Amino acid sequence: MTQLKNDTFLRALLKEPVEYTPIWMMRQAGRYLPEYRATRARAGSFMGLCTSPDYATEVTLQPLDRFPLDAAILFSDILTVPDAMGLGLYFAEGEGPKFQRPLRDEAAIRALAPADMGKLQYVFDAVASIRKALDGRVPLIGFSGSPFTLACYMVEGGGSDDFRHVKAMLYSRPELLHHILEANTQSVIAYLNAQIDAGAQAVQIFDTWGGALSHAAYREFSLAYMQRIVAGLKREADGRRVPVIVFTKGGGQWLEDIAAIGADCVGLDWTTDIGQARARVGAKVALQGNFDPNALFAEPAAIEREVERILQSYGQGSGHVFNLGHGISQFADPAHAGALVEAVHRLSRDYHGAA
C-alpha cells in the first residue's frame, strides 16, 4: 500500500506527538456541498450513490478537494447492514430512511440472522476504490452504526422522536431486543473487519441513539455490545495500528464507562466540556470533537473564537482530533466549513511542541 503522506490523524488517535490538531467533519461529504448534490443527481438516488464504488469514491474525495482535511471517511450509510439482513431499506423523499419489514413480531425477530457480507461487497469495493484514489493523501475511516442504534431503526421502521416501539421491547421483552443486538453485533464485527481488510485505516462506531437510554439500559443494551465489537476487531493492518473511535451522542455522563471498553478514542458531542472530559478520561483515550455543528451558521470570526475556546479547553499536547459534535447541516455554508478547517490548523499549532 502507498505510504501515507499525512498521518497526523492516526498519530493523534494514538496520542503520539503531532504538529497541529487534525480535523475531519462528520458527514463531510454531503448535501451542503454543491458538487455532492450534482453527483447525487447523476446517481439518481441516495442508494445509487452508496452502492456504486465509483460514485462513493467521487463523493468521498469531494470535501478533500475543497478543504485540507486530515482524514477521509467512507461515503455510505449505517443502514446498509440491516438492509443486508433483509429488512428492505428505502428512502422516502423528505422522510429519510425507512424499512419495508420492521422487526415487530417475535417470529421475524427469532428468524433474524447476521448480515450476509456478500450483500455488502459494494461497500468493501468502495473502500478499496477510495483507498486507491487517495494514494496516501490522508487516512481513510471506515464506520458502522452501533448495534443499539441499528436496532432503533430496525424496530421503529425508520427514524423516531420517541423510540416507543424499541423502548417497549426493551422493557417488556428484553430477550427479543438482545436477540436483535446479538445479530447486529456479529454483523458489525464482520462488517468493520471487512472494511479494514479492504483498506480502512481507522474505524468509528456511531452510537447515535445511545444517549436516549437510561443509565442502566445504556450499559446493558448499548455499551456491552460495543465492547464486544471493539474486542472482535482487527487492530493492525499494513504494519500499523487501526484505531477505533466510539461515539455515543449524548453520552457525556458515561465517559468513564465508554473509555473502559478498549477503544482508542471517544467521540464527544458539543454538550460536554472537552477539558473536563480530558481530565476524566484523557489518560486512557484520545478525544474527538466537539464543535457545535450549528455554530457553522455564525460568521467566520465567531467560528474562530469557538475553535480557540475548544482548543484552549483541551489544552497542550496530542490526543485531540477536532471534529463537529455531530454531522454537518445540509444548510451549512461550505465557506464557513473552510473557515473552521483553516482556524483549527492555524490556531492549534500553539498547543503542540515541535513534533
From Swiss-Prot:
SUPFAM superfamilies attached to this UniProt entry: UROD/MetE-like
InterPro entries: UROD/MetE-like_sf, Uroporphyrinogen_deCO2ase_HemE, Uroporphyrinogen_deCOase
HAMAP family from the UniProt entry: URO_D (MF_00218)
Record-level GO BP terms: protoporphyrinogen IX biosynthetic process from glutamate
Recorded catalytic activity of this chain's protein: uroporphyrinogen III + 4 H(+) = coproporphyrinogen III + 4 CO2
Record pathway: Porphyrin-containing compound metabolism; protoporphyrin-IX biosynthesis; coproporphyrinogen-III from 5-aminolevulinate: step 4/4
Protein name (database record): Uroporphyrinogen decarboxylase
Organism: Chromobacterium violaceum (strain ATCC 12472 / DSM 30191 / JCM 1249 / CCUG 213 / NBRC 12614 / NCIMB 9131 / NCTC 9757 / MK)
Gene: hemE
